[in-house]
Amino acid sequence: AISTELGFDDLVSFDVNSDCELEYMIFGKLRLMISEDNFKDIIGENKDEFYYLKDTKNNTYQLRIDAHNHSQIYDEKTLDLTNHIEKLEKTAIDNLSLDLRLYNTTQTREIMKYIDSKVNKKQVYKLPEDMKTYTANFKKGLYKK
């Protein structure tokens, strides 16, 4: 998969005739960090499905502990590039992906209705108000000002 740190201008520079299939995530929570600190000291025996880290600005970041006892920390906002699918189709990207692994069944159904409405150009189904979305670096790229 191609990093979502790359903006659209970066994506159009890829060779369309490449033998390598290119994948780009258009919806989901971005993993920000993997840490070898598994936070067991803090969590203890509490076996909740999700844990959160909170920063000094009150942003909350979802934390999951993987099978190797590494902590995976995810962005609090949800990447949503569904408004840019037609632009992405004009690049060398072969596959667009959705990452819904951090959502429960009810949330996944809501997200799928939303995406279906966008892809099929129906009246747009709204996501729940508490689901904050953003386009990450799609418009400007990571290192551009």
Name each model-derived stretch.
Residues 1-145:
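Active-site pocket-lining/capping segments in soluble small-molecule metabolic enzymes
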